[in-house]
A protein has these predicted regions:
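Short acidic, hydrophobic short linear motifs in intrinsically disordered regions
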Residues: 50-61
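Basic amphipathic alpha-helical segments that dock to polyanions
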Residues: 57, 68-79, 219, 241
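A short, conserved structural fragment
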Residues: 76-87, 290-291, 319-320
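Glycine-centered, phosphate/nucleic-acid-interacting loop/turn motifs that mediate DNA/RNA or nucleotide
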Residues: 79, 223, 279, 288, ...
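Short, amphipathic alpha-helical interaction segments positioned at domain boundaries
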Residues: 89-126
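Ferredoxin-like iron-sulfur electron-transfer modules
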Residues: 94, 227-235, 255-306, 324-327
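Catalytic cores of enzyme domains
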Residues: 124-267
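Flanking helices and flexible, charged tails adjoining ferredoxin-like Fe-S electron-transfer domains
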Residues: 301-351
Length: 351
């Protein structure tokens, strides 16, 4: 019976826009067993991909509203589902595995969970989640790399931050997972920046607006790629990603998933006359899009994700970030609902 509830949960997760593809080894079931108790799996599998009032859910699962709310709130504290409250009424929905349940597993991330995640991603999980479009995340450029008159409103990371009311930092689940399997990353662990839209997010450490702005500068300085949810409005976080740990960038560098992240509407160019061949840009590029030819750096535009780290770090200004021509610009979905609808359509699913 307990195995059956995990099968039900896996199927429910795969019907969400993000997807939770099955594998030939069934490692995804072991993964769910590690994270959810049988009761939690049963409850989660009976939720939908839309926010519903607790009364509706309670009737469906055969519990009183009070008992259902107590159990669901406790699950929400551990990131096992999504929760919202309007006035005195509670709403819940099934959370995607990625981005959702997985990112909330910082406290439970141990050697076993880390290896299960790695096996799942490497054996079809990453491809099944990252290949469907629109992508989960999109790249936004380093602030110092783009002239203000060229930056698009939804690509302005500082403007996104300043429109929020509260701020927090938390550890990066990707680096935490990689550390457990023996990969030591040189970048800091606490690099995920959260805004007011996700103020209930577990494991977040509250910081001030000034600290958040300073952190964005620091992330760019040390060479981390800004990525956000692939929407124009309602952005709740900025991930600061490295190519060795970040799942979506590893999609490009390790698993051959070229569209695992939506590229920024910019591309890097390096002036061969100005380049002194110091290699700083090659070291800062997280997706290996820059190589050396005849003593100078050259950008492979097909690989360039437009993050601008080469331009912001070039000691003599040889590397620059340019906006793509108008016919190459790609606008992200307006909001999360539009993103979900487009993704469901592209996966041949409906709500």
């Amino acid at each position: 019976m307990s195995h059956y509830v995990y099968e039900q949960l896996a199927e429910a997760l795969n019907k969400l826009p993000n997807g939770f593809p099955r594998t030939s080894s069934n490692v995804e079931i072991q993964l769910l067993k590690k994270i959810f108790s049988p009761e939690e799996a049963s409850l989660a599998s009976q939720l939908t991909g839309s926010m519903e009032p607790v009364d509706t859910i309670a009737e469906r699962i055969g519990l009183s509203a009070e008992e259902a709310e107590a159990k669901l709130v406790e699950m929400a504290k551990h990131g096992l589902l999504w929760y919202d409250k309007e006035e005195s009424k509670s709403f819940f929905r099934l959370a995607p595995f990625i981005v959702g349940v997985y990112e909330a597993q910082l406290e439970s991330m141990d050697h076993e969970l880390a290896h299960l995640v790695e096996e799942y991603l490497a054996n079809g999980g990453a491809a099944g989640i990252m290949k469907p479009q629109p992508a989960l995340h999109r790249v936004i450029p380093a602030q110092k790399a783009v002239k203000s008159e060229l930056i698009l409103p939804y690509d302005d990371v500082k403007a996104i931050l300043l429109s929020s009311k509260s701020f927090g930092l938390r550890d990066c689940i990707c680096r935490a997972q990689q550390k457990q399997i023996g990969h030591e990353c040189d970048f800091p662990l606490r690099t995920c920046l959260f805004f007011s839209a996700l103020e209930r997010s577990p494991h977040r450490y509250t910081i001030s607006k000034e600290e958040a702005l300073a952190f964005l500068d620091k992330a760019e300085e040390i060479g981390l790629v800004h990525t956000v949810s692939n929407v124009m409005k309602g952005i709740g976080y900025v991930c600061n990603c490295c190519g060795c740990c970040c799942g979506i960038l590893r999609g490009i560098t390790e698993w051959g998933i070229e569209n695992s992240v939506a590229y920024a509407n910019y591309y890097a160019v390096i002036d061969a006359q100005e380049c002194v061949g110091c290699g700083t840009c090659r070291q800062r590029c997280q997706v290996d899009a820059i190589s050396e030819e005849n003593g100078v750096s050259v950008v492979d535009r097909k690989k360039c994700i437009g993050c601008g780290l080469c331009a912001s770090g070039c000691p003599n200004g040889a590397a620059k970030l340019k906006r793509k021509p108008d016919n190459e610009l790609v606008n992200p979905p307006v909001d999360f609902k539009a993103w979900e609808n487009e993704r469901l359509h592209n996966r041949g699913l409906s709500r």
